[in-house]
Amino acid sequence: YSQMLKKLCEFEPRRQFIVSVIQKIIKEAEDKDIKRHIMVIAHNKSILTYLHNAIRDMNIASVGYYIGGMKEKDLKITESKKIIIATYAMAEEALDIKTLNTLIMTTPKTDVTQTVGRILRIAGNNPLVVDIIDSHYTFKNQWKKRRAFYNKCKYTIKYMKNEMIVGENGAGAAEDNEGENSVFLQNKCLL
């Protein structure tokens, strides 16, 4: 499983797709005059590093890390950034950033109760959760469990077809695969 996750995190078209999702969320928020405070989370630090650097280098928004081993003062500085790059472990611990209203889950996970709860606990802040669904059997099964949780909580689920172009060996033709969707949960939880 860890090898599959590693390869998933290193797949360049997927990483670029995630950056484009972040850009789209920020643009839509600006167009609708919605203030977004975004947390991007993953298990794997390599994808977090990639996303942090891409966001910074493309000047998408202010960005900072929220990962284990950081000093308290550095975590506080990161809390003021528009985009917070964090591990699932840090997002599930004593995280209490009241202004967070957007979550982008970049790696699959079965139990998202605590993570999603961080975003959805404050009513009226236009909460948005983006849950990226990957097509491998194992990851699809994890999605089914997350979807059951979302349905149980009566979150509104909207599907967005991905715009990632993938072919043999990662280049070429477009894949039209039901499993490769982003799910958005809006005003509840957007997948």
What residue spans do the PLM features occupy?
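Conserved RecA-like P-loop NTPase helicase motor core
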Residues: 68-156
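Conserved helicase motor "Helicase C" RecA-like lobe of SF1/SF2 P-loop NTPases
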Residues: 34-70
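Structured helix-beta-strand junction loops
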Residues: 28, 34, 58, 80-81, ...
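C-terminal helicase lobe
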Residues: 3, 126-185, 189
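Active-site catalytic pocket residues across diverse enzymes, especially alpha/beta-hydrolases
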Residues: 26-29, 55, 59, 119-123
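Conserved interdomain hinge at the start of the Helicase C-terminal
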Residues: 1-40, 50
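Short phosphate-engaging motifs
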Residues: 14, 47, 111-112
